[in-house]
Regions:
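Loop/turn-rich, solvent-exposed surfaces of beta-rich toroidal or solenoidal domains
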Residues: 13, 17-23, 215-306
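Beta-rich, blade/repeat-based domains predominating
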Residues: 16-29, 62-73, 110-127, 156-178, ...
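Short, conserved, GDST-rich strand-edge loop motifs in beta-rich repeat architectures
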Residues: 18-31, 84-94, 180-197, 271-296, ...
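Conserved beta-strand positions in repeat-built beta-propeller and related beta-rich domains
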Residues: 36-39, 76-82, 122, 129-135, ...
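Short loop/turn segments that connect beta-strands within beta-propeller blades
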Residues: 49-51, 89-91, 142-145, 204-207, ...
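Blade-loop segments of beta-propeller domains
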Residues: 53-121
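Beta-propeller fold detector
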Residues: 55-61, 94-109, 148-155, 212-213, ...
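Blade-level signature of beta-propeller repeat domains, shared across WD40, Kelch, NHL, RCC1
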Residues: 297-302, 306-361
Length: 361
């Protein structure tokens, strides 16, 4: 099926998007919205399907857009030096909108400093947990400090800003930290850079042991329908991990560096990015395979059928956009929006418990 030009979304940055009609139909039928964060540009794309045959793109600017998570009516976004918390105003019974099913307004910003925050999720108490890659730990926000460390791999004896193992991904289960992903199990400063590409591992947080090794720069461990999935990013693959044997099984080669795994129905949703290095990196599995297949670098949102391995090149970004980090699927939301800080700071934008107001279209 031929790709269909949807619309230009940022003329100043010369970025265009193309969308596969199969994806438009899927998003329309299942009635969900996707949040897609572009690390390289700091854009958060709210992709909705309010009308048949086309998509709507709402773009919010961030100073680097990293991990994101939705829990109930709450949204959290990790940025370069802060964690931003939002609330869906339409969840208030007194507030309605003729256009949107979700309207997230910023409610607080926690300043962290540059922790190189990566993936993020909520715990059972509704508090955001995030990977502080620079400090090789999983952390939460603190009322008095930049962050509150909650978990670190057993080989990290002291928290220092040295990005030893490039801890990057986390998986929650029933509100508790279950699994993490890292590039290598090392306590040396930026030690992962000096080890083989296939030194990547997924660890059990509770057991402090690896459940799978031999991965290539893995990201986004996720439990879905009782199975553990992983993006084997440096190999350009999505796969599942057998929790008994620890064996990794490739589901599909996706032709790009994947990050930000979400699910809807039988599909895995994530972004693939173009390489940061303009030149070929010798012996890097993804680069070797792209070169052997004569495939171009791509910046796309993908949907992979977990039953068949079929890959839908859902949305292709051309031009300035090069790198995605995270995705979030918002179910039962045909049209969503996120308010920018300047919108929320408008002096006449006031809500309170007894307020009965109508959001502008």
């Amino acid at each position: 099926m031929q790709n269909q030009l949807v619309q230009p979304i940022d003329h100043s940055a010369h970025t265009r998007v193309h969308c596969d009609p199969e994806w438009v139909d899927l998003q329309q039928q299942l009635g969900f919205t996707v949040l897609l964060g572009t690390r390289s540009m700091g854009d958060l794309h709210v992709v909705s399907a309010p009308n048949p045959g086309s998509l709507n793109f709402h773009v919010v600017k961030f100073p680097l857009c990293m991990g994101m998570a939705v829990q109930g009516n709450h949204l959290a976004v990790a940025c370069k030096t802060d964690i931003r918390l939002y609330y869906d105003l339409i969840a208030h019974p007194q507030i309605s909108s003729p256009v949107y099913q979700r309207s997230y307004s910023p409610r607080s910003i926690h300043f962290t400093g540059d922790l190189d925050a990566h993936e993020l999720d909520f715990d059972q108490h509704g508090q955001p947990l995030f990977v502080a890659a620079r400090y090789s730990c999983v952390a939460s926000i603190s009322p008095v400090h930049s962050f509150a460390p909650l978990w670190q791999p057993k080989f990290i004896s002291k928290l220092t800003p040295e990005d030893c193992c490039h801890l990057n991904g986390l998986c929650m289960s029933n509100g508790e930290l279950k699994y993490v992903s890292m590039f290598a199990a090392t306590a040396q400063p930026e030690g992962w850079r000096n080890l083989p590409f296939n030194s990547g591992q997924v660890w059990s947080a509770a057991d402090q042991e690896a459940v799978c090794t031999g991965l290539v720069q893995p990201h986004s461990p996720r439990l879905h329908n009782g199975e553990l999935y992983i993006l084997n990013s440096g190999a350009g693959e999505i796969g599942r991990i057998d929790l008994v044997s620890g064996r990794y099984e490739c589901i599909a080669f996706v032709g790009g560096y994947g990050r930000g795994l979400s699910f809807v129905g039988d599909y895995a949703i994530f972004g693939i990015s173009k390489p940061r290095h303009e030149s070929y990196v010798p012996n890097f599995p993804l680069h070797d395979r792209l070169k052997s297949l004569n495939l171009p670098d791509r910046c796309q949102l993908l949907a992979v059928n977990l039953k068949t391995g079929n890959v839908i090149q859902a949305i292709t970004f051309e031009g300035a956009a090069r790198e995605f980090f995270d995705t979030v699927v918002i179910p039962d939301c045909r049209h969503g929006v996120i308010m920018a800080l300047d919108e929320a700071q408008h002096p006449q934008f006031v809500t309170y418990e007894q307020d009965d107001c109508l959001l502008p279209a």
